[in-house]
A protein has these predicted regions:
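Terminal alpha-helical segments
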Residues: 1-148
Length: 148
């Protein structure tokens, strides 16, 4: 099983790749590659969140299922994800089996917004965990002070 860090790293790579191929839009290959990799980036972020909330993510590419699992765990997801989750899932499967996809620039832009919001949410979660650990360390070290 991949770790939270692994999912974050892989999501960032997918996002970087989709941004890079945007330079070649409207080339069909560039569009399909970007759609596939933005889906992969969001999928991996959702899986990282599921791990952060203490569960193992399901082995699926279905964004709707992964988002539902996150919500069941109490994760507040970007509202715009509801608008594009089916499209993202379709983009992932279409890239593998269908040479032509229905591309929506508006939905692609929304997917990038979702990526950015999830990235911020994951970073905030990890930073709060670091602060909690620092507070625990401080509390424990206070108990080790010599008394006179």
């Amino acid at each position: 099983m991949l770790s939270v860090s692994d999912f974050i790293t892989l999501a960032a790579r997918d996002y970087t790749l989709c941004c890079k191929v945007e330079e070649d839009f409207p080339d069909e290959y560039a569009v399909t590659a970007a759609c596939y990799h933005i889906q992969q980036a969001v999928e991996k972020q959702l899986k990282a969140l599921i791990l952060l909330y203490g569960e193992a993510p399901e082995f699926t590419h279905n964004i709707v299922k992964l988002a539902k699992k996150c919500e069941d765990l109490g994760v507040v997801l970007p509202e715009v994800l509801d608008d594009i989750s089916d499209t993202l899932t379709m983009w992932e499967s279409s890239m593998r089996y269908d040479p032509f996809i229905a591309f929506s620039e508006k939905k692609y832009s929304k997917a990038k917004i979702v990526y950015d919001e999830l990235k911020t949410q994951i970073n905030d979660f990890l930073n709060s965990m670091d602060q909690d650990e620092d507070e625990i360390d401080e509390d424990e070290s206070e108990g080790l002070q010599p008394t006179m």
